[in-house]
From Swiss-Prot:
Domain of life: Viruses
Miscellaneous comment as given in the Swiss-Prot or TrEMBL entry: HIV-1 lineages are divided in three main groups, M (for Major), O (for Outlier), and N (for New, or Non-M, Non-O). The vast majority of strains found worldwide belong to the group M. Group O seems to be endemic to and largely confined to Cameroon and neighboring countries in West Central Africa, where these viruses represent a small minority of HIV-1 strains. The group N is represented by a limited number of isolates from Cameroonian persons. The group M is further subdivided in 9 clades or subtypes (A to D, F to H, J and K).
Residue ranges of the region described as Disordered: 24-49, 82-123
Bias kind Polar residues: ranges: 97-112
Gene Ontology BP annotations: mRNA transport; viral process
Name the record gives this protein: Protein Rev
Keywords: AIDS, Host cytoplasm, Host nucleus, Host-virus interaction, Methylation, mRNA transport, Phosphoprotein, RNA-binding, Transport
Biased composition (Basic residues): 36-49
Region span, Homomultimerization: 18-26
Notes concerning its domains: The RNA-binding motif binds to the RRE, a 240 bp stem-and-loop structure present in incompletely spliced viral pre-mRNAs. This region also contains the NLS which mediates nuclear localization via KPNB1 binding and, when the N-terminal sequence is present, nucleolar targeting. These overlapping functions prevent Rev bound to RRE from undesirable return to the nucleus. When Rev binds the RRE, the NLS becomes masked while the NES remains accessible. The leucine-rich NES mediates binding to human XPO1.
Subcellular location as annotated: Host nucleus, Host nucleolus; Host cytoplasm
Protein's gene: rev
Length: 123
């Protein structure tokens, strides 16, 4: 799309055409026949759709050269990881949790939900 990426654009268009052909090659089954026959045809159609979906993902990931697995995030050393959120308040320029500056909670806090849930439980 920009500069010298014309070759990759052509590859992407080619991949999209292939995927379109794959989806067009698997039309929805006809509504004729007995209930069991229609159910079996739909079941087989869904199985083919799943295969086409996985093939399409593989084609696009190959074309775009994306990793198929999840991308790992860089984490700090295990010694620096804590479960106590009180240590994190005021460090690193992070915003304090809602309601700590003014002392009032917002309706989205768990306290607000417990009030709503409490009224329903009394009925």
């Amino acid at each position: 799309m920009a500069g010298g990426s014309g070759n990759s654009d052509e590859e992407l268009l080619r991949a999209v055409r292939i995927i379109k052909i794959l989806y067009q090659s698997n039309p929805y089954p006809s509504p004729e026949g007995s209930r069991q026959a229609r159910r079996n045809r739909r079941r087989r159609w869904r199985a083919r759709q799943r295969q086409i979906n996985s093939l399409s993902e593989r084609i696009l990931s190959t074309c775009l050269e994306r990793p198929t697995g999840p991308v790992s995030l860089p984490l700090p050393p295990i010694e620096r990881l804590t479960l106590d959120s009180a240590e994190d308040i005021g460090t690193g320029g992070t915003d304090p949790p809602q309601g700590t500056e003014t002392g009032t909670g917002s309706p989205n806090t768990p306290e607000g939900h417990s009030t709503i849930l409490g009224t329903g439980a009394k009925n």
